[in-house]
C-alpha cells in the first residue's frame, strides 16, 4: 500500500469513528456527546424548508440544531446505513416521533469531517407531499 492510500485509510477510519459517535448520540439521547464532534466552522444545510433547507453556520448554531433533536423525548433515530470514503460520509436513516412507520421520515445526511470534527452536513428527506 502506498503512503497516499494509507492516509486515505486513516482518514476514513477517523471519519467512521466520528460518524459512529454522532449516530450514537442520537440513539442514546445524549446531546452533550455532540459537543466535541462539531467544528467551529461547521455548516448545516437542514432538510427543511424546501427548496434549500435552513442554513446554520458555526459551532453553536449547529449544536443548537443537533442537540435539540438528540435530546427530544419520545423520538428515536435509526441509522440504516453508513458509507464512508475518506473525509466524507453518507448516513441513510429513519427518524421516528411516534409508533410505526406512519410517524417517521427517512432521509440522508451527506457529511464531511476534518480533524475529527464535522465541518459540513447536508440533510435530505423523503417528503409526503
Language-model features: where?
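Alpha-helix C-capping/helix-to-loop hinge sites
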Residues: 22-25, 45, 76, 96-97
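Short, low-complexity N-terminal intrinsically disordered segments enriched in polar/charged residues
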Residues: 1-40
